[in-house]
Amino acid sequence: MCDDDVRALVVDNGSGMCKAGFAGDDAPRAVFPSIVGRPRHQGLMVGMGQKDSYVGDEAQSKRGILTLKYPIEHGIITNWDDMEKIWHHTFYNELRVAPEEHPVLLTEAPLNPKANREKMTQIMFETFNSPAMYVAIQAVLSLYASGRTTGIVLDSGDGVSHTVPIYEGYALPHAILRLDLAGRDLTDYLMKILTERGYSFTTTAEREIVRDIKEKLCYVALDFEQEMATAAASTSLEKSYELPDGQVITIGNERFRCPEALFQPSFLGMESCGIHETVYNSIMKCDVDIRKDLYANTVMSGGTTMYPGIADRMQKEITALAPSTIKIKIIAPPERKYSVWIGGSILASLSTFQQMWISKEEYDESGPGIVHRKCF
């Protein structure tokens, strides 16, 4: 299975970024924004070969003249025409493969509507003529990537966060909780609090700059109130950032106020529980006998769990909520930004997995509904 000609493809479609590559690799070959852009004005760009749409980085770089759309909202595909364009771009431009020659493993959000998985299956077999495909739940793949089959995954990306308890490889749907608070909201919040400092960021292009500031300078405080006091008393927490035009801005308490919203969604005007309470609530919805295993195997995954200090803070918060005798372990692997993809790469290259694929023959025989029988 090692040569590129027959290797399975693994495509993790996130709300913000699409990660794609070959099963057996240790990292995705292509990572690009999940966006499709269309020209705002017809016939404006002379001599540009006038494409009717652009995907990923190209859409990003031409964003000044395009209208950008994200076909995946809060982890769920909402625009199938644009999604097809993203998959087409993934196969033909990024990976440069013929999709009819490779099995493909796709990922889906927890609690993805049934009709959506059928539609994914249908597009793969009918539009791209895949020989075989499989749909796996993102959080389950992250758990596999950490070398476990039991645990609770906090998966937080750009568009949505989920807490997913998994026992012996199976997600427990009744205990999965979703929080519509993720990276994009934190970027927006940072834009807002930087405006209070007198820096104005408003356009979509400027939002990308703020996202970069967030990724480079933000961190989670172990004790928020104490950190606020430190920031007020001295400049020790201040950092400077150079904007593309050479202007240098200074940011202080914004560095930890931004990701604090994960623990205190009221900062964003949301009434939901913070990520620590959501993990706890998810565990409490599970059978009393497996809770101990979940507390001891709490795995973080996704780009929004990449803030320095987040694991220690999580440990502290969950310890405060859980029974005092219980052992709590937060696992935050360094590669967690891509752990969904890595889990997919591991799964698709296992010899025992080869009989799990849905083949073209099975699809032709049973139709899209086969996905519920073979992927669970």
Curated annotation (Swiss-Prot):
It comes from the Eukaryota. SUPFAM superfamilies: Actin-like ATPase domain (SSF53067). GO terms for cellular component: cytoplasm; cytoskeleton. The modification N-acetylaspartate is found at D3. Keywords: Acetylation, ATP-binding, Cytoplasm, Cytoskeleton, Hydrolase, Nucleotide-binding, Oxidation. Residues 1-2 form a propeptide. GO terms for molecular function: ATP binding; hydrolase activity. Actins are highly conserved proteins that are involved in various types of cell motility and are ubiquitously expressed in all eukaryotic cells. Belongs to the actin family. This is Actin, muscle-type A1. It comes from Bombyx mori.
